[in-house]
Structures are given as structure tokens and as C-alpha cells.
Amino acid sequence: MKVRLGVDMMGGDHDPLVVWEALGEVLLSSIGEQPVEFTVFATSDVHHQLMNSPLSRSVRIVTAEDFVSMEDSLLAAVRKKRSSMALGLDALQQGDLDGFVSSGNTAALVTLARSKIPMISAVPRPALLVSVPTLSGFAVILDVGATVSVNPDEMVGFARMGLAYRQSLSSNSNQPFTLGLLNIGSEERKGTDSHKQTFRMLRNIFGSAFLGNIESGDVFSGKVDIVVTDGFTGNVFLKTAEGLFDFLRRILGDRLEKSIKMQFDYTIYPGSIISGLSRLVIKCHGKSHGTALFGGISGAIDLARANVCSRIADRFGDNVV
């Protein structure tokens, strides 16, 4: 299957050419040996810089009139109808792409994606889903920033999406997965009233698969396969983990084995998936360096090839709206 992947070159904290270099590395890797077609979305000045690059013969370039900056309000982002982000999502909505990757403004990407891409009808609200390495493999966490304030019903929806995601990527249809609610303590009485109600609902719905409240340290130990949280708490947790890993990488330097360095580089792999959409949208970190972008783009190709969004929708047994 040929994967048609769109990449937004604009809006991140890095130079757009860093994205271009990551694309080149993907095409030179074993991933690039499989059928893949890249379309990048960039402003005219960036397009001009790319014209003499040998890579331009292998990548389609779409010129955008503008781009969504990190400082743009949601209203400003929505008004930029011909931004690189908007054009990429339009192409995805029209079926010209199998997936879209952006390092741009998170709130704008979630809002624009939700307005342009049909949602799975059983999903109450989209969530940013990430995979993190654990002692037993990996765990998925959602939400990590799509929505700051959510209610218990929406948290249960996140749990269902996380479970559907794990099941959709598993080769064993009967493989059991466990869930935990990220909280300030493991006791049932801990947390806000919303957390307590969410705890009761998750226990009633998922039974023994729900292992109760978990603390931040439990995530990397591999205690559960799916971590459920609101966007505010999840985002703080994720950025704290990123900061810690970056600190360790800087302190230990060459003393880290190569395999461990790879784990740190791909802490968010393949970026944050906007789960709940019927089509694949990946949000890479705005500060992603070349190696992390390589991982995000490569992971997006793998997920598109696996038809992960269709599989999640099938798990919900529902149509899209």
C-alpha cells in the first residue's frame, strides 16, 4: 500500500528546513524503501529555498499563503484559510492524503482538524494520545493537551479510545489490556470530585481491567497499558517527563547506550495522535529536533499503513459524523 503523507513545514519552533532534512532521512531509510508519497505545505519563501534541493524531485510542494504561528489565537488561525496547516487538513479531508503531520500550534491544529475531519460519532471529544516507553513495553496516555477541562463522561470516552487504539495495533485479538486513572494518589478517595466520579465509572465499565488510580511514577513502570487523564494534567506530566529525559541525556551524554538514547529521542512516538478523528492527524512537538521529527514522520507512515483510524472506528462499531 502506498502511503500518501502530508507534512506541514511551518509553525514549529524549529527552522522549516529541519523538517525537510527529516523527510530526506526518512526517504533514505528502510521506511522510505516502501511506497510512500510526501506532500509538504510551505510558504512561498520556504518553497523558493527548496527548489534547488535534489529532494524536491521526490516530494510534492504545495505553496501556502500563510502559516499558523504559535502566538496566533484560535480566531486568527481559523481565519487563515490558506495557511499551510489548513491546506494540509483540506487535502486530508478530501481524501488526497492518508495522514497529516504538523509541529504547529496545538490548539489550532485540534480545532481546525475537528472542523474539517469527521469525528467517530461515538467519541464525545478528541484527545491527544501519545505512546511512552515503559519497563514492560509502552503505554498510551490520553489526553495530553487537546482539552484542559473535561467531565467524567469524556474521560470514559478517552479510556475507550485508548483501549481501541491498543486493540487496533495488537496482533492478538484476545490480548487483555489494563487501564489506570492518573491521580495524586492511588487511593480511591484521592483527587477532585470529577476524578472520584470518573474512578467509579471506569470501575463499573471496565471491571478488573481497571487497576484504579495511578501516580506519575507508575506510568514508566508499566503498571498499566492505558493511562487516562484530562488534558491539563496529561500535558504537565508529559512536559515534565520530556524535561527529565532531556536533562538525563545532557548529563549522561555519551555514557548512554545507543539503544537508550533512541528511547529518549522517541519518547513521544510517533508524536501525539488526535484520537477520535476518522483520519490520521499527528501533532509533533513544536520543539522537535531532527531525530524526533524522523520518528514522528516514520511513525505516521506506520500508522497510516496500518489503517489505525479505521480500525479504531471499527472497534467502536460506529460510523463517522
Language-model regions, residue ranges each:
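Glycine-rich phosphate/diphosphate-binding loop of Rossmann-like nucleotide-binding domains
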Residues: 11, 15-18, 39, 43-45, ...
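Glycine-rich phosphate-binding loop
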Residues: 91-110, 190, 195-201, 205-261
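Glycine-rich phosphate/nucleotide-binding loop
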Residues: 113-141, 222-227, 231-321
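N-terminal phosphate-binding or glycine-rich loops at protein starts, especially the Walker A/P-loop
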Residues: 1-47
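Short glycine/serine/threonine-rich phosphate/pyrophosphate-binding segments
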Residues: 15-20, 49, 81-92, 99-113, ...
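Phosphate/nucleotide-donor binding subsite
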Residues: 54-97
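Flexible, glycine/charged-enriched surface loops at secondary-structure junctions
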Residues: 33-36, 169-179, 208-217, 258-259, ...
